[in-house]
């Protein structure tokens, strides 16, 4: 169904690493807002599942990814929707619903680039949805620092709000980075 692309292997490897780190973060910083380890893992694994579908449907989507990853002002999905009739977040949410993923997971997939709602605080999204997004953003940042891959501007747009939501601060990141590096070393990744 999907064309063989070396980028997809790297994509799924990164998704798996971010999922592992997200689940570990729940254990490390504590369960809150009914978000369990397995919820964080599942969401982080599938949050970008719309990307391969967009790649298949729109031949120029690779270019869109490059533009969206480099945009410091607009939401990632806003860039996508300026070039295509939908975004990977909408496609991923629909795919998650068709797989009967929990509604909080589907909503988190739909809104995981919505930095305005993350910054807005309580009321914009359900607390569990916001927490799932925050966990995955912190995990993605840790993964990017560990691997030097998949750089984007999402941390600059959402990082501070995600740390606040998780009751962390930037000074906690080196310790989390060290713990995640140890975890991934033990996992053989």
Give residue ranges: language-model regions.
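A short structural micro-motif
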Residues: 114-116, 183
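Divalent metal-dependent phosphate-bond-processing catalytic cores, especially two-metal-ion Mg2+/Mn2+ enzymes
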Residues: 46, 95-107, 124-189
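Acidic/His-rich, divalent-metal-binding segments that scaffold phosphate/diphosphate chemistry
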Residues: 1-90, 94-97, 103, 110, ...
């Amino acid at each position: 169904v999907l064309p063989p692309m070396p980028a997809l292997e790297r994509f799924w490897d990164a998704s798996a690493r971010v999922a592992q780190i997200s689940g570990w973060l729940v254990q490390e910083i504590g369960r809150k807002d009914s978000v369990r380890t397995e919820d964080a893992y599942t969401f982080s694994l599938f949050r970008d599942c719309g990307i391969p579908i967009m790649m298949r449907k729109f031949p120029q989507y690779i270019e869109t990814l490059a533009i969206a990853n480099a945009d410091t002002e607009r939401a990632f999905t806003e860039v996508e929707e300026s070039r295509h009739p939908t975004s990977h977040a909408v496609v991923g949410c629909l795919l998650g619903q068709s797989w009967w993923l929990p509604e909080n997971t589907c909503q988190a997939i739909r809104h995981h680039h919505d930095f305005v709602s993350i910054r807005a605080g309580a009321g914009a999204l359900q607390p569990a949805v916001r927490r799932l997004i925050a966990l995955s953003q912190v995990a993605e940042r840790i993964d990017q620092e560990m691997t030097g891959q998949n750089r984007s501007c999402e941390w600059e747009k959402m990082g501070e709000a995600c740390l606040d939501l998780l009751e962390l601060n930037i000074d906690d990141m080196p310790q989390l980075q060290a713990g995640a590096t140890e975890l991934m070393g033990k996992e053989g990744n």
